[in-house]
Curated annotation (Swiss-Prot):
Family: Belongs to the peptidase C25 family.
Matches recorded under InterPro entries: Caspase-like_dom_sf, Caspase-related_regulators, Pept_C14_caspase
Protein name: Probable protease Ga0182885_104520
Top-rank taxon: Bacteria
Job of this protein: Probably a dedicated protease for substrate gasdermin bGSDM; cleaves the bGSDM precursor, releasing the pore-forming moiety, which integrates into the membrane and triggers cell death. Involved in defense against bacteriophages. Expression of bacterial gasdermin (bGSDM) and this neighboring protease is toxic in E.coli.
Presence of the UniProt keyword Protease in the record: yes
A Gene Ontology BP annotation from the UniProt entry: proteolysis
A GO molecular-function descriptor: cysteine-type endopeptidase activity
Keyword Ligase part of the UniProt annotation: no
Enzyme class: hydrolase
Keywords: Antiviral defense, Hydrolase, Protease
Pfam families in alphabetical order: Peptidase_C14 (PF00656)
EC code: 3.4.-.-
């Protein structure tokens, strides 16, 4: 199979002040790398180039290009599909030009702006998500998207904005092949051009091309192949660090200034593909300076530098500090040997891909001063014989996602909480802890021959996000470490928590009769039964958290929220409710409904967005718990849970003291799903699927992940459990239908799809999509078929949960007010 590419560069726009200078140049440079045999290895005939202007020999450098209009972008993609048969080894998509993020109710839709876009023809903007989704239905084994574009909302005061979708959609075909997406900047933020006369270029593309050429730490040395590799993870880290290093301000009159920061996205597992392989002789030596503290030990100290092949350089006696070495770029181990002192650490590792300094602290004593023979090194024992090593890596947090990688970035093993690898070759390894969003925190370690290492990884410090920090400190959840929170004794130390995590746990704790959860109940959230009555057995509770920093704005914002809830077969009610503020904590509010078991619709009307309607399932003896958070940048996230209202066993095998801790794991899974980290989410969901006690939300999320990962043959037990125990959930029957269809039971699949409609609408967007395709496949007629099709056709894309703008349901009613 072959590689394919679409390259787009747009300088010319509808107004002179909207035009760019460097986008076409960047696109031509990217085309040059893509068609190079040492780069993307895309045959010229397999690459389509779209430029604006496309017919100016001076700006286009003589390249043959087509105009970069919306129609031509779509036609170019379809042409690649026809020529390739929608399959290949790799597909590359590069875009340089203007972009935007349009606020679409509960989601922010990022799009590119073709040449024919204008402030009146705004529908010419093209949704990136819809392009990504279309490629998920193809068989390109690795898909790379590089987007050098702004993602800021285009005009001051514009809140809702239409971005056109890719007009020829197809559903994804599990298992979807991995997508690697790199954005020049964060949602809602500009991307900056570097203005040098005659050499204008995008800061992002400038760093990207440098990384693809192997600059700095974008590359890693592969010992077995004796060459450098530029892999995705290191490439993104290099681009991110390089753009941030330039501190490109993208805001005016803001303190602190808003800085351009690249972001990555994409549905992928632990894949870390190689984008370039480069020979050793291409790169010059780099400098390493070793400092000794105290300096007085220098005259009796030997400094030894080694790599995987053994000792490379020695310096004895040390006559001057720092000790200077010029070495080939790669990973090194530094040791010292001295009679009366030892280094504070046995060895010091350094990724030497740029000039570096290492300071070695020397303390009185012996212990690491065994003479090192010329044949010894990190891969050999002192006598020259190689013995395997072992490593136990763990986290303070039992739910943390861990990765063990070799020195070149190849994944060896992944796990939750800890990984034990008993027999590994001595050498350098990379130990990673990833947040639910996939942000890595890496530690480089060296395993010597025969060594048994026990290493605890720390997560990145908690982000200072205003309301979250206030709650954590005032509730005494911090335990002295900036990256560890302890929300309850039933949970213990936890990392990578968000405001949504605390609200989910608090919502669970206040609705459970447990001796645990005192800090969480102290937030002041009222339990469902304290509002609905002790006899209530089913209903809904919504928790709102707003992290905008201005208290007056936050209070006014939450006071303007309106909520409506009605039976699925009824009309939208005129009466609305408003959430009640949680006492003493600005930014928190709650609303509660008692409900009979059944299927409902919920309209959430935020003051700066279109009203959005979500399907809601009220289950017997369970609470439909919804958590809605808005961060300081205006991004709204929506989380769902179905905790029990009666006494039962805990649903999480790692937390047996109470039931509410399972909500933390479910929140982590949802956060990973929101950014496409499905393999990471599945590691956590798999334990819940195998647990003794069934949690309906764990079943839904776990089954969703099985389907996304192409593991539908494993749906048998989850589908049966959901259908038998939680048949009131429409999603349960969609999952059962998918399983039956997968094993060829067409009649049972059709019956299950009908039962899904009998029980309302699926609450998960993926299940709604599968229901629609099932209805079409089996010709299903049902009184709710039109409703399901309407929700699907008007649905808000990019959400984990089914949602539809309320205006797509029917005209808004007259309004009366009532508190929740």
């Amino acid at each position: 199979m072959q590689n394919w590419a679409l390259v787009i560069g747009i300088n010319r726009y509808w107004r002179a002040d909207a035009c760019l200078k460097g986008a076409v140049k960047d696109a031509l440079k990217m085309r040059e790398w893509l068609t190079s045999i040492d780069g993307g290895a895309v045959p010229s005939r397999n690459l389509i180039l779209l430029l604006s202007p496309h017919d100016d020999p001076e700006s286009c450098g003589g390249a043959s290009a087509l105009p970069a209009t919306q129609d031509m972008i779509i036609q170019a993609i379809e042409q690649i599909f026809r020529k390739s048969g929608e399959e290949g080894d790799r597909f590359f998509f590069y875009y340089s030009g203007h972009g935007l993020t349009a606020r679409m109710s509960f989601s922010n839709e990022s799009g590119i702006i073709p040449n024919d876009f204008s402030d009146t023809l705004t529908n010419k903007a093209l949704s990136l998500r819809s392009i990504f989704e279309r490629f998920q239905s193809t068989r390109f084994r690795e898909q790379f998207f590089f987007i050098d574009a702004c993602r800021n909302i285009p005009w001051e005061g514009e809140r809702e904005f239409l971005i056109s979708q890719y007009p020829l959609p197809k559903p994804p075909k599990p298992p979807v092949f991995p997508q690697f997406i790199m954005y020049a900047t964060s949602p809602g933020v500009k991307a900056v051009e570097i203005h040098e006369a005659g050499n204008e270029r995008g800061a992002f593309t400038d760093a990207l091309l440098a990384g693809l050429r192997g600059t700095g730490n974008a590359k890693l040395w592969h010992e077995e192949d004796r060459e450098y590799m530029v892999r995705w993870d290191n490439l993104f880290r290099f681009v991110e660090e390089e753009v941030i290093r330039r501190r490109l301000s993208v805001s005016e009159n803001r303190v602190p200034p808003l800085i351009q920061e690249p972001r990555q996205f994409g549905e992928r597992g632990s894949c870390n593909p190689t984008l370039a392989s480069l020979p050793a002789e291409v790169f010059p030596e780099v400098s390493l300076d070793v400092h000794l503290d105290p300096m007085t030990v220098a005259s009796q100290t030997e400094v030894i530098v080694g790599d995987l092949g053994g000792v490379l350089r020695r310096e004895f006696p040390v006559t001057a500090l720092p000790v200077h070495f010029d070495l080939q770029p790669r990973t090194y181990s530094i040791r010292t040997s001295t009679p009366d002192f030892r280094s504070e650490k046995r060895y010091y590792q350094v990724d030497l891909y740029g000039p570096a300094e290492v300071s070695i602290k020397m303390v009185p004593g012996t212990g690491y001063s065994t003479p090192v023979s010329p044949s010894s090194g990190v891969s050999k024992s002192v006598d020259g014989n190689t013995a395997t090593a072992s490593v136990l890596m763990r986290s303070h947090d039992p739910l943390a996602y861990l990765e063990l990688l070799d020195n070149s970035g190849t994944t060896i093993e992944t796990g939750i909480g800890q990984i034990y690898r008993p027999r590994v070759k001595p050498g350098f390894y990379r130990l990673r802890l990833r947040t639910p969003e996939g942000i890595p925190h890496e530690r480089l370690v060296e395993l010597s021959s025969g060594e048994s290492a026990d290493i605890t990884l720390d997560a990145p410090p908690q982000t200072d996000s205003g309301l979250f920090t206030h709650i954590a400190f005032t509730s005494h959840m911090y335990q002295g470490e900036p990256n560890i929170i302890q929300p309850s004794e039933a949970i213990g130390p936890a990392q990578s928590m968000h405001l949504s995590t605390i609200l989910a746990l608090a919502g669970g704790a206040v609705n459970e009769d447990s001796s645990y959860g005192g800090k969480l109940r102290g937030l002041g959230i009222t339990s469902f039964r304290n509002i609905a009555g002790e006899e209530a057995t089913s209903g809904m509770q919504i928790l709102f958290g707003n992290e905008v920093t201005a208290p007056a704005f936050t209070d006014n914002y939450l006071s303007a929220v309106r909520l409506r809830c009605w039976g699925i077969d009824r009309g939208i009610p005129a009466e609305y409710r408003q959430p009640l503020h949680v006492a003493d904590i600005t930014g928190l509010a709650q609303a509660t409904w008692e409900m009979e078991p059944g299927s409902y619709l919920l309209s959430i009307e935020l003051p700066d967005r279109m009203p959005v309607v979500f399907p809601v399932a009220a289950l017997s003896n369970r609470l439909s718990l919804l958590v809605v958070t808005q961060d300081a940048t205006g991004v709204v996230n929506f989380f769902r849970y179905l905790p029990s209202l009666k006494d039962e066993l805990p649903g999480d095998p790692r937390y047996e003291a109470a039931r509410f801790p399972v909500l933390r794991r479910l929140e982590y899974i949802q956060r990973s799903c929101m950014v496409g980290r499905f393999e990471q989410a599945y590691q956590n969901a798999r334990e819940l699927l195998n647990a003794k006690w069934i949690d309906p939300m764990a079943g839904l999320l776990g089954s969703y992940l099985l389907m996304r990962l192409g593991k539908s043959d494993e749906l048998c037990i989850p589908a049966r459990n959901l259908s038998e125990c939680f048949g009131e959930l429409s999603d349960s029957h969609v999952i059962a239908a998918e399983y039956e269809a997968g094993i060829g039971n067409e009649e049972k699949a059709a019956d299950a799809f009908r039962r899904a409609l009998d029980n309302g609408l699926p609450i998960m967007s993926d299940c709604l999509t599968k229901l629609i395709y099932g209805m079409e496949r089996y010709g299903i007629e049902h009184p709710r078929a039109a409703l399901a099709k309407s929700y699907y056709s008007h649905g808000i894309k990019g959400l984990l949960w089914s949602a539809c703008p309320r205006k797509a349901c029917e005209a808004a009613p007259g309004e009366t007010g009532a508190d929740a």
